[in-house]
A protein has these predicted regions:
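Conserved MFS/SLC helix-loop-helix module at the cytosolic interface between two early adjacent transmembrane helices
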Residues: 62-101
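Helix-loop-helix hairpin linking two adjacent transmembrane segments in secondary transporters
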Residues: 141-192
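Central cavity-lining transmembrane alpha-helices of secondary-active solute carriers
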Residues: 53-69, 271-284
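Helix-breaking motifs and short loop linkers at transmembrane-helix boundaries and internal kinks
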Residues: 42, 75, 96-102, 130, ...
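Structural signature of the two symmetry-related core transmembrane helices
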Residues: 78-92, 299-314
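Juxtamembrane intracellular "pre-TM" segments in multi-pass secondary transporters
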Residues: 2-5, 194-232, 257
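Cytoplasmic helix-loop-helix junction between adjacent transmembrane helices
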Residues: 106-147
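Extracytoplasmic gate region of multi-pass secondary transporters
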Residues: 30-31, 226-277, 281-282, 337-345, ...
Length: 480
């Protein structure tokens, strides 16, 4: 039983959610101001994808495991505090970048710093909240994704339009420093495995390279060699690959297709990619915890059903003739798709013991960062570039799109027909590239469906082995 009151645990989860909100905000701000950066620094969409995905994700993934292993032994609160101060400061420094190379380097630094957030946070939450409520608690934490996106979209869109993209980075970075100090003062380091069976809280032996390698192999085996868990991990990775690419370029699509300014696009992104997504995350976690009282299969079925329903809405968002219909469809697609996150994270935390949770989360975030975030925006940006070039060539243009429309805009003094050809080709290329990414959402749904077979047996086996406690009723005061 946890020694902390339900009220204090709620405060802890909310403070960790605030940290993840700034994590998401500092990551998302690039996609919101991407058109302004593209025009200012004369970049291609593939370079934008590199900035928003690969540069950040490569270092995020490489830094995740060492920091996670440190979090299994050292204070997770201290790790989060230092990491939050570092990535917030580096985000603000993006305003000083004068070239693509400089901005790329700073974003790589942000990636290293942000690697200290979620492994520590997931481990902390799992030591404050019992297994029967973890999907719900982790859903609240994961809402930081949508909250950060809302702030990035609303604030970044407004500042990009009225003060420039550089000021947007400053505004996104600085508040995180204050949040880090509050977390350091308010959040206590909980006992490892305090809400789990005794075997889950076993102490680690003294540090040795051999032991660390053995621990990494054990966690990897838990995620890879158990078929239902592997399907959950594959589904999460494929869905994130699609989502990172899709949501990175959807603000640009609204500007290109409907000729909207940064401010309105920011508000649309905040509502459709933030509020609706956040509600979906919360509902998915709470619903799966509730239905899992009868069958643990619902931890996979809720994402599978929600993902299936989301697909036609994502397609409709890209073929709707007006921005209002597109925004409404985008909101519904995000609501149903993102119901998958809480159940997936909750299941993973429940199949490893207390001294391996940060490491398990780090493995997940390697998939989410190096594969999904690292390649998703880059892939979608590359596909958009290819579709745009082919659309522009089909219009009968004598020169390539990049030569005629540097930065996506016709050269100064170009004829009206050339300006319209540039705009039309870019809008059509964006639509086709984003439609292609929806196919990866469908692929992920298939893995969630497959995960539902055998998930009952998997989770029951871990409960009997002492990796988790059985029912909510066996732990007093564990309600969020």
């Amino acid at each position: 039983m946890t020694p902390y009151s339900a009220g204090y645990r709620r405060v802890v989860v909310l403070l960790l959610t605030a940290a993840y909100t700034f994590n998401s905000m500092d990551r998302s701000i690039v996609s919101i101001v991407a058109p302004s950066i593209k025009a200012d620094l004369q970049l291609t969409d593939a370079q934008l994808g590199l900035l928003g995905g690969t540069a950040f994700a490569l270092l995020y993934g490489l830094g995740g495991l060492p920091i996670a292993r440190l979090a299994e032994r050292a204070s997770r609160v201290n790790i989060m505090t230092v990491a939050l101060i570092a990535w917030s400061s580096l985000t603000a420094m993006c305003a000083l970048a004068a070239s693509f190379g400089q901005l790329l380097l700073i974003r790589a630094g942000v990636g290293i710093a942000e690697a200290g957030c979620s492994p520590s946070a997931h481990s902390l939450i799992s030591d404050y909240v019992a297994p029967s409520r973890r999907a719900s608690a982790l859903s609240i934490y994961t809402c930081g994704i949508s909250l950060g996106y809302v702030l990035a979209a609303a604030l970044g869109g407004y500042l990009a339009q009225h003060a420039g993209w550089r000021m947007a980075f400053v505004a996104a970075g600085l508040p995180g420093v204050l949040t880090a100090l509050i977390i350091k003062g308010a959040v206590r380091e909980p006992p490892r495995g305090g809400v789990d069976a005794p075997s889950a809280a076993a102490a680690l032996p003294p540090f040795s390279v051999r032991h660390e390698i053995a621990e990494l192999r054990a966690v990897a085996a838990a995620l890879v060699f158990d078929r239902p868990i592997l399907h959950m991990v594959l589904a999460l990775t494929l869905g994130a690959f699609a989502a990172y690419g899709f949501y990175y370029f959807i603000p640009a699509y609204f500007r290109r297709e409907f000729e909207l300014d940064s401010g309105p696009v920011g508000l649309i992104s905040a509502a459709a990619g933030g509020v609706a997504v956040g509600l979906g995350i919360l509902v998915g976690g709470a619903l799966s915890d509730f239905l899992a009282r009868w069958s643990a299969r619902w931890y996979a079925l809720v994402p599978a059903i929600g993902g299936t329903v989301s697909l036609p809405f994502y397609v409709l968002a890209l073929v709707a003739p007006g921005w209002k219909g597109a925004a409404a469809a985008l909101s519904l697609g995000g609501f149903f798709w993102y119901a998958s996150l809480g159940p997936t994270f909750g299941v993973v935390q429940n199949v490893v013991d207390a001294r391996r949770r940060a490491t398990a989360t780090a493995f997940l975030y390697i998939c989410l960062s190096m594969l999904a975030l690292g390649l998703g925006p880059l892939f979608v940006g590359w596909v958009i570039d290819r579709f745009t070039e082919s659309s522009f060539a089909a219009s009968g243009a004598a020169r390539s799109f990049r030569e005629t429309c540097p930065g996506g805009i016709a050269v100064a003094g170009a004829a009206t027909t050339v300006q319209e050809a540039c705009r039309s080709a870019l809008a059509l290329g964006s639509r086709r590239g984003l439609l292609l990414s929806v196919g990866f959402f469908a692929w992920a749904v298939g893995h969630y469906a497959l995960a539902s077979f055998g998930l009952n047996k998997t989770l029951a086996g871990h409960r009997s082995a002492g990796a988790a406690v059985p029912a909510a009723s066996s732990v007093q005061s564990d309600s969020m």
